[in-house]
C-alpha cells in the first residue's frame, strides 16, 4: 500500500490556507504526523479520507487518483478513527459494531466473525453488552478503532487517538496501533511527542500547513544535536533572561534550583550550561522554531 501526496493545497473560502503545497510519501507501517493544534493535520486527513476535496494538487492511493469518480473505490480501502468517537450512545457496543458492519455492506456471518476477533484484540469482549454511553473515553476510542477496522482497510488513519486518555489507556491504544500496522499502513496524527516515540520510526512535522521535516526519527534527532543545553541556576533573573534568549523544552524547579533545557544555534555563554542528549521533544521544538 502506497500513498503519495503531490503539491497539495487546501484553501478555504475565507482565504485561510490550511495545507500549503505539501509533498509526502507514506510507507507501509506506522507513519507519524506531528504538529500543534491548528497545524493543518486534521485538514490533511479530511482530504485523505475523501471528506474534503483539495484546492489543488493530487493524492494517489496505490496509483488510484483521488477524484470524485474514484472516491467509492478509495473509501473501501480506508479506515478512519476521528478524534471524537461518540457513536450511538443508546446502543450496546456489539449493536453499534453490527450496525457499522451493515453500513459497510459486510455479510452478517463475516461481520460477526470480525467483531468477535477485534473485540478480543482490543480487550472489549467483556464490555460488549454495555451501552456506548456507559463507556470510558478510552473504551469509546477502542470501539472507534474496531469500527475503523471492520471492513479490513489497507490504510488506517487515526486522528489524535490518545488525547484525553489516562496513561494506561494511552499505552493500550499505541500498542494496538503497532499491532495493526503489521498488516497495513497507518497514519498516526498527534501533538503528543511521546506517542510517536513509542510507535513509529518515520514521521513528518507540520506547522502552519507546511512540512518542516519528513524522514526518520534518528535524522530528526540529529538535526537538533549540538543545539541542546541544560542549565541549573538559583538566580531567577538569570533563568528569565535565558528564557528570553532561548527556546525552552523543559523547566523544572528542583532542590538545586531552576533546571532549564535550552535550544538554540549557539552554546550559551552563561556559566553552568552543559551540552546534553537530544530528546524527540527537543528536536520537535528545534525544527518548529528555526
Q: Residue locations for each model-derived region?
A:
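Walker A (P-loop) phosphate-binding loop of ABC-type ATPase nucleotide-binding domains
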Residues: 36-40
Amino acid at each position: 500500500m502506497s500513498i503519495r501526496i503531490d503539491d497539495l493545497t487546501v484553501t478555504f473560502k475565507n482565504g485561510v490556507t490550511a495545507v500549503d503545497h505539501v509533498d509526502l510519501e507514506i510507507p507501509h507501517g506506522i507513519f507519524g504526523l506531528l504538529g500543534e493544534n491548528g497545524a493543518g493535520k486534521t485538514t490533511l486527513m479530511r482530504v485523505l479520507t475523501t471528506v474534503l476535496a483539495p484546492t489543488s494538487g493530487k493524492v494517489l492511493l496505490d496509483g488510484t487518483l483521488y477524484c470524485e469518480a474514484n472516491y467509492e473505490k478509495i473509501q473501501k480501502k480506508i479506515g478512519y478513527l476521528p478524534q471524537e468517537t461518540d457513536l450511538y450512545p443508546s446502543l450496546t457496543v456489539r449493536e453499534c459494531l453490527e450496525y457499522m458492519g451493515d453500513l459497510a455492506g459486510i455479510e452478517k456471518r463475516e461481520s460477526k466473525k470480525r467483531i468477535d476477533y477485534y473485540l478480543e484484540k482490543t480487550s472489549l469482549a467483556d464490555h460488549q453488552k454495555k451501552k456506548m454511553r456507559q463507556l470510558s473515553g478510552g473504551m469509546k476510542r477502542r470501539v472507534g478503532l474496531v469500527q475503523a477496522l471492520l471492513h479490513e482497510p489497507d490504510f488506517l488513519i487515526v486522528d489524535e487517538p490518545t488525547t484525553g486518555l489516562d496513561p494506561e489507556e494511552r499505552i493500550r491504544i499505541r500498542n494496538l496501533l503497532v499491532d495493526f500496522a503489521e498488516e497495513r499502513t497507518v497514519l498516526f496524527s498527534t501533538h503528543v511527542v511521546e506517542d510517536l516515540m513509542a510507535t513509529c520510526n518515520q514521521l513528518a512535522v507540520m506547522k502552519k500547513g507546511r512540512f518542516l521535516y519528513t524522514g526518520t526519527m534518528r535524522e530528526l534527532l540529529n538535526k537538533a544535536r549540538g543545539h541542546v543545553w541544560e542549565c541549573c541556576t538559583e538566580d531567577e533573573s538569570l533563568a528569565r533572561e535565558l528564557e528570553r534568549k532561548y527556546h525552552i523544552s523543559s523547566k523544572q524547579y528542583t532542590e538545586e534550583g531552576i533546571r532549564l533545557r535550552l535550544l538554540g544555534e549557539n552554546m550559551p555563554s552563561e556559566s553552568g550550561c552543559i551540552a546534553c542528549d537530544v530528546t524527540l521533544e527537543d528536536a520537535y521544538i528545534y525544527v518548529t522554531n528555526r
